[in-house]
Amino acid sequence: MGFREKLKLYVITDRRLKPEVKSVRQALEGGATSIQLRIKDASTKEMYEVGKEIRRLTQEYDALFFVDDRIDVALAVNADGVQLGPEDMPIEVAREIAPNLIIGASVYSLEEALEAEKKGADYLGAGSVFPTKTKRDVRVIRIEGLREIVEAVSIPVVAIGGINVENVKQVLSAGVDGIAVVSAVMGASDVKKATEELRKIIEEVLG
């Protein structure tokens, strides 16, 4: 499975919903192809310890592993990449610091998408496709905005924001390479089953 294909089901951790390591294992068992460690309120040491465990699991399941924002932690745990938002380290600086990391850019408009591609992002996390409880005050681009981004860039696009089993087919119809989810998996009573259900639909649409 190549890099682009490994973006098809991208699961993001949220400790408000589930503890990271156990839920990541369950998501990987269910067919997650990428994992992102997102912790906003932990010490660097804790992020490192959790990151090491997730790195081990993602290697075991041949999945990609990304760390949100923290390039230092990504390098320390030998992650595959880092996800950077508009308020994080600039893409071109991150590339200088960590030339071998895959850099994902979170974008919320067509202009931001084009700028991120120009600056050297390897893939885009584009959203929010729908309103979401995970992030407040987020811009909603809907399917139309998502499709505009997909058609304008040549790098892979992963859709994010309010995606679940009910709307995933609609999202995939925009031509994205994959979907990123938080609550659709981490908020489920059965993480493995929720991941399996999403993966099944993705395989039906993307193959």
Swiss-Prot record:
A GO CC term assigned to this protein in UniProt: cytoplasm
Keywords: Magnesium, Metal-binding, Thiamine biosynthesis, Transferase
A molecular-function term among this protein's GO annotations: thiamine-phosphate diphosphorylase activity
Residues the entry annotates as binding Mg(2+): 69, 88
Positions that bind 2-[(2R,5Z)-2-carboxy-4-methylthiazol-5(2H)-ylidene]ethyl phosphate: 132-134, 162, 182-183
Pathway field: Cofactor biosynthesis; thiamine diphosphate biosynthesis; thiamine phosphate from 4-amino-2-methyl-5-diphosphomethylpyrimidine and 4-methyl-5-(2-phosphoethyl)-thiazole: step 1/1
Chain sites annotated for binding 4-amino-2-methyl-5-(diphosphooxymethyl)pyrimidine: 36-40, 68, 106, 135
InterPro entries: Aldolase_TIM (IPR013785), ThiamineP_synth_sf (IPR036206), ThiamineP_synth_TenI (IPR022998), TMP_synthase (IPR034291)
Free-text remark on how the cofactor is bound: Binds 1 Mg(2+) ion per subunit.
Reactions catalysed according to its record: 2-[(2R,5Z)-2-carboxy-4-methylthiazol-5(2H)-ylidene]ethyl phosphate + 4-amino-2-methyl-5-(diphosphooxymethyl)pyrimidine + 2 H(+) = thiamine phosphate + CO2 + diphosphate; 2-(2-carboxy-4-methylthiazol-5-yl)ethyl phosphate + 4-amino-2-methyl-5-(diphosphooxymethyl)pyrimidine + 2 H(+) = thiamine phosphate + CO2 + diphosphate; 4-methyl-5-(2-phosphooxyethyl)-thiazole + 4-amino-2-methyl-5-(diphosphooxymethyl)pyrimidine + H(+) = thiamine phosphate + diphosphate
GO BP term, example: thiamine diphosphate biosynthetic process
Pfam family, one: TMP-TENI
Entry EC no(s): 2.5.1.3
Swiss-Prot/TrEMBL cofactor(s): Mg(2+)
Family: Belongs to the thiamine-phosphate synthase family.
HAMAP family assigned to the protein according to its UniProt record, in alphabetical order: TMP_synthase
Its biological purpose: Condenses 4-methyl-5-(beta-hydroxyethyl)thiazole monophosphate (THZ-P) and 2-methyl-4-amino-5-hydroxymethyl pyrimidine pyrophosphate (HMP-PP) to form thiamine monophosphate (TMP).
Protein name: Thiamine-phosphate synthase
Lineage: Archaea, Methanobacteriati, Methanobacteriota, Thermococci, Thermococcales
